[in-house]
Amino acid sequence: ESYGWAGKILRVNLTTGEIITQDDEKYHKYIGGMGMAYRIMYEEAPMELDPYDEKALVIFGVGPLTGAGVPCSGRMNVTFRSTWSKGHSIIDAHMGGHIGSMLKYAGYDGIVVSGISEKPVYLRIEDGEVSLEDATEIWGKGTFAANKWMVEQNGREFETASIGPAGENLVDYSTLNTSFGNSGGAGLGAAMGNKKLKGLAIRGTGSVKVADPKKVLELSNYMMGNLIGGNNNHNVPAQPQSWAEYSATSGKNRWSGAPGRMWKKAPGGPVDTGEQPYNDINKVALRCFKGYFDFGAPAAEYTVKNGGCSSCPIRCYTEYDVDP
């Protein structure tokens, strides 16, 4: 019995519209979305293949820990032939948000996309139901508008990712964006734009089976308290805290949570971010007061809470309420 893995991948041919499901057990020994994708590339995408060729692949992949609740395991890997780098080497773009975990909850470890669509489309996945949907209405729109439209069309339970006009026009360093992150450079946006693939909308209601849930919880708590929570020269508070040996001499970094720094519009009343001792795993998420790092004290007046990517305690995003 396989643990961690969902056990199958999707293959989507945009030229023909064919969508099939494939068992992926033979890729498990390569561990993770990147390893699986590189093996598929090795088998199916010759080095001389141009990134804009119809046979060029774009592979979305997640690993066995994705969706299992292990800290910092929620990212999705996207492997393709770079439109940016010299020689169009095979490259990876990693992205956060919640879409990687949602892909696993939908029952898939990856999506292998080939072909070129005649018209703009997006890939819709809802558990076992997979379809290519018309994206003509959002072709030409930016990523915020496109992601918003896909959510409105499908429901708030869906996680979405979209390219923008840069990708559509084959800008060779364009990206794919979700609500909580982006794919970085190397031209994933252009690779998808060439295929007329505007984006993804995914909803999954499944779960990830692990061999020993108790051990996974122990490992996760160790990572939270001893590794992520550990105080060292690469991870120190912006302001002195009573438990911490060091703090940032500049007084300014993303670890800006500190006594007196508030989320003043938090539901139920203001929340003082306070101190975050290394061994209190319930306070790790209070550390990264990104709004305070960006805008200083005025940010606290409008902060609702910190947000972030799936399974990540670092919480890089600040949610604001700017209504009077």
What are these regions (language model features)?
Residues 1-94, 98-324:
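Intrinsically disordered, low-complexity segments enriched in small residues
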